[in-house]
Structure formats: structure tokens, C-alpha cells
UniProtKB/Swiss-Prot annotation:
GO molecular function: structural constituent of ribosome
InterPro entries registered for this protein in UniProt: Ribosomal_uS2 (IPR001865), Ribosomal_uS2_bac/mit/plastid (IPR005706), Ribosomal_uS2_CS (IPR018130), Ribosomal_uS2_flav_dom_sf (IPR023591)
Record HAMAP family: Ribosomal_uS2_B
GO biological process: translation
Species annotation: Burkholderia mallei (strain ATCC 23344)
Gene3D superfamilies cross-referenced by the UniProt entry: Glucose-6-phosphate isomerase like protein, domain 1, Helix hairpin bin
Family, per entry: Belongs to the universal ribosomal protein uS2 family.
UniProtKB keywords: Ribonucleoprotein, Ribosomal protein
Protein name: Small ribosomal subunit protein uS2
Amino acid sequence: MAITMRQMLEAGVHFGHQTRFWNPKMAPFIFGHRNKIHIINLEKTLPMYNDALKYVRQLAANRGTILFVGTKRQSRDTIAQEALRAGMPYVNARWLGGMLTNFKTLKVSIKRLKDMEAAVEAGELEKMSKKEALLFEREIAKLQKSIGGVKDMGGIPDAIFVVDVGYHKIAVTEANKLGVPVIAVVDTNHSPEGVDYVIPGNDDSSKAVALYAQGVADAILEGRANAVNEVVQAVRGDDEYVEENA
């Protein structure tokens, strides 16, 4: 479903940061200021947001993987919820340096987590002493928190979706190094450099974050549904061709 400018206004997408913290590279997307707060031009944001969603739909239709990244307190739950709804990986606790650029090391940790989860399923905890079980549970909880959202990622994602590029500078830098496209919400206090699909907007409001993340998740589901429909139509077309030539 298409997002309207009214929805963006209601979610507070247009509220930037205090004028003294601004980044001049965001000047083209700023409408003005009110009470020393920059106001983002939603007439710029809306089409750029729609361009980002169009790219997301195409990527999802081609079975691409989009990694959701949002580790700030006000975005953690929404990022996990919407990524799971879209069947995509996510990072919502802390970005571990090398998550993309040193994926081999991450794979070792993912294997450890999966082995530990399998051990729990098999009832191995009951065979341990109380102390061993406690240490085991602590380790598995730590791994689930830090890499649970990426345990089924399988490889480098085809794109990353980031809320707050300043807070997730390392994630953006790693994606840039590997040539992984970056879709990101950029507030008035950060630079849009290194971002392929810029969404100028408030990156602090939980309502605004929910609007962005829901839109991206919806676009992924739409892209996949469209791809399935195209396959069904193609199969039907082939069947009709066979019947006509029978």
C-alpha cells in the first residue's frame, strides 16, 4: 500500500535535528527550520522513499536478500518484527565489526549457535551439571542476541536497509567496501554519502521508524508475490500454447 504525505506528517518524518547539528550535505532536502529544528522537505522525501521501495520490490522479485539494520532502542523491536514478517535477516542489538567484511568469522559463530540450539532440542542440557548448563545458557543467549537475526542469512546480503547512518557508520562502510547497495534513512545531522537510496527523514521517532520499516517489508512481500504471479501466468501461457498446437 502506498504511503501518503499525510502519513509521513503524522509519523513526524519531517522533523530533523537541531539546526546547530546539521550536515550541509543534507541542504537539498531541508525545507526550512522552526524553533531551531530543521524541517525536512517531504516533497523530496516521498518520491525518494518510493524509489527505494521500487528497488526493494525488484530485488525481492529476484529472490534478493535485504539485511535490516536498526540497533537504537526506539527501533530495535520494529526492525526485528518487520524483518521477520518479510522473511529477511536483521541486526537489532549491536553491529559486530566485520559482519559483512569478515563473513567467514561470522559463519563460525552462526555454526556454533546452530549447534547449541540443536543440543538444546536434543535434551543435552539435562545431561549437564547445573554450572555447565548455566554457562551454556548464558552463551546461547548472548549469541542469539547478537547474531540470531542473521543465522539464516547464508551469505553477503544483496542490499542493506539502515535506519540512522551515523549510528551505523560501520555497517554502511562495510557495505560500501563490498559494493552492497545501501538503502537508508538519513536525518539532517548526517551525510547521505555512501547511500545508494537516500530516504531523507527523522531517524529518532519510533512512529517514523515503523513507517519506513513496514513500507520496506510490504515492498518485499509485494515483490515476491508479483514474481510468483508472473511464474503462474507464464505457466498458464505455456499450457494454452500447447493446447492450441495439440
